[in-house]
Amino acid sequence: MARVKRSLNAKKKRREILKSAKGYRGQRSRLYRKAKEQWLHSMTYAYRDRRARKSEFRKLWITRINAAARMNDITYNRLIQGLRLAEIEVDRKVLADLAVNDFAAFSAICEAAKAALPADVNAPKAA
């Protein structure tokens, strides 16, 4: 079997790695081996965090909805329960957007959710 010389392919591969490692600090942007290690870690972090971003945004939406719901004298979990009972299908992303940008519409949704809840659930807890 003939010997395989890799000079062109190896140079191309190294050039691509160093090109994608631009902006890294110190040796990690200049030396191939360090750049490759950092690039592999970077790709791992990017993959992981693309998935984590989804749950982080959901947490943010829930926090915003809860804050706005409490201004309307209802808690987050009662609001969600009321929306289910009233058969209002609005996802958390839209609810959070309404809470921030159109508070009047959010208040109307809260009132509809309150009306759908059973009477004993709306009553405040006795101390």
From Swiss-Prot:
Belongs to the bacterial ribosomal protein bL20 family. GO terms for molecular function: rRNA binding; structural constituent of ribosome. Binds directly to 23S ribosomal RNA and is necessary for the in vitro assembly process of the 50S ribosomal subunit. It is not involved in the protein synthesizing functions of that subunit. Gene3D superfamilies: 6.10.160.10, Ribosomal protein L20. GO terms for biological process: ribosomal large subunit assembly; translation. This is Large ribosomal subunit protein bL20. CDD domains: Ribosomal_L20. Keywords: Ribonucleoprotein, Ribosomal protein, RNA-binding, rRNA-binding. PANTHER family: 39S RIBOSOMAL PROTEIN L20. GO terms for cellular component: ribonucleoprotein complex; ribosome. It holds the Pfam family Ribosomal_L20. It comes from the Bacteria.
